Amino acid sequence: MKLDIRPTFLDSALRQSAPVQKGVRKMVETAAHLSLGELLNHEGVHLEKAKGLLTRDGKPQYTLRVTRSARAIATVEGDTLVLLFVEPDHDKAY
């Protein structure tokens, strides 16, 4: 899948602890090699639609597992996964 890594994602990823940064690298590498369908079924990435979270233009947002507690927030535009932000607290990601 194509990736669009937004500055907000990069900034938030760089502010995280070393284990979360390592998880971000692993998640990005995995996502880059899978289709959307494969990501939706991948147990490690655990891509799921975030209920009630929409972008400003009304597109659904998704979460991806970075570590046991950290999640990446993303949206999908065509065949591109747009990475928006890294949230270190699982509960705050939703």
Features from the language model and the residues they span:
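Basic, Lys/Arg-enriched alpha-helical interface segments
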Residues: 1-70, 76-94
